[in-house]
Amino acid sequence: MNIRPLHDRVIVKRKEVETKSAGGIVLTGSAAAKSTRGEVLAVGNGRILENGEVKPLDVKVGDIVIFNDGYGVKSEKIDNEEVLIMSESDILAIVEA
């Protein structure tokens, strides 16, 4: 993928969500909600502070994150792959193995 996010932006590929319940029932429509977990594919250089310094991001390429799938998250198709572009502040947590 040939994309470089700017500043505090992060490119995330959404993880596939389970389409079966624990009891084996196939979920469809609103019951099969979109996942709010994904893998970080690219990160920007960092957030520019008021004093002009750049604060590096806490997330890095390869991290699995939980994110807020809200207003500030933009969905784009790049190289025939659906990705999300978001600010680091839209990321709620890093999943540690």
From Swiss-Prot:
<dbReference type="GO" id="GO:0051085">
    <property type="term" value="P:chaperone cofactor-dependent protein refolding"/>
</dbReference>
<dbReference type="Pfam" id="PF00166">
    <property type="entry name" value="Cpn10"/>
</dbReference>
<comment type="similarity">
    <text>Belongs to the GroES chaperonin family.</text>
</comment>
<dbReference type="GO" id="GO:0009408">
    <property type="term" value="P:response to heat"/>
</dbReference>
<dbReference type="GO" id="GO:0051087">
    <property type="term" value="F:protein-folding chaperone binding"/>
</dbReference>
<feature type="modified residue" description="N6-succinyllysine">
    <location>
        <position position="34"/>
    </location>
</feature>
<comment type="subunit">
    <text>Heptamer of 7 subunits arranged in a ring. Interacts with the chaperonin GroEL. Can form asymmetrical complexes, composed of one GroEL and one GroES, and symmetrical complexes, formed between one GroEL and two GroES oligomers. The asymmetrical complex is the functional unit. It was suggested that the symmetric heterooligomer may represent a transient intermediate in the chaperonin protein folding cycle. Another study shows that the symmetric heterooligomers are substantially populated only in the presence of proteins that cannot be folded by the chaperonin.</text>
</comment>
<comment type="function">
    <text>Together with the chaperonin GroEL, plays an essential role in assisting protein folding. The GroEL-GroES system forms a nano-cage that allows encapsulation of the non-native substrate proteins and provides a physical environment optimized to promote and accelerate protein folding, probably by preventing aggregation and by entropically destabilizing folding intermediates. GroES binds to the apical surface of the GroEL ring, thereby capping the opening of the GroEL channel. Regulates the ATPase activity of GroEL.</text>
</comment>
<dbReference type="GO" id="GO:0005524">
    <property type="term" value="F:ATP binding"/>
</dbReference>
<dbReference type="GO" id="GO:1990220">
    <property type="term" value="C:GroEL-GroES complex"/>
</dbReference>
<dbReference type="GO" id="GO:0042802">
    <property type="term" value="F:identical protein binding"/>
</dbReference>
<protein>
    <recommendedName>
        <fullName>Co-chaperonin GroES</fullName>
    </recommendedName>
</protein>
<dbReference type="InterPro" id="IPR037124">
    <property type="entry name" value="Chaperonin_GroES_sf"/>
</dbReference>
<dbReference type="GO" id="GO:0019068">
    <property type="term" value="P:virion assembly"/>
</dbReference>
<dbReference type="GO" id="GO:0051082">
    <property type="term" value="F:unfolded protein binding"/>
</dbReference>
<keyword id="KW-0963">Cytoplasm</keyword>
<dbReference type="InterPro" id="IPR018369">
    <property type="entry name" value="Chaprnonin_Cpn10_CS"/>
</dbReference>
<dbReference type="GO" id="GO:0006457">
    <property type="term" value="P:protein folding"/>
</dbReference>
<dbReference type="GO" id="GO:0044183">
    <property type="term" value="F:protein folding chaperone"/>
</dbReference>
<dbReference type="GO" id="GO:0005829">
    <property type="term" value="C:cytosol"/>
</dbReference>
<keyword id="KW-0143">Chaperone</keyword>
<dbReference type="GO" id="GO:0046872">
    <property type="term" value="F:metal ion binding"/>
</dbReference>
<dbReference type="InterPro" id="IPR011032">
    <property type="entry name" value="GroES-like_sf"/>
</dbReference>
<comment type="function">
    <text>(Microbial infection) Essential for the assembly of several bacteriophages.</text>
</comment>
<dbReference type="InterPro" id="IPR020818">
    <property type="entry name" value="Chaperonin_GroES"/>
</dbReference>
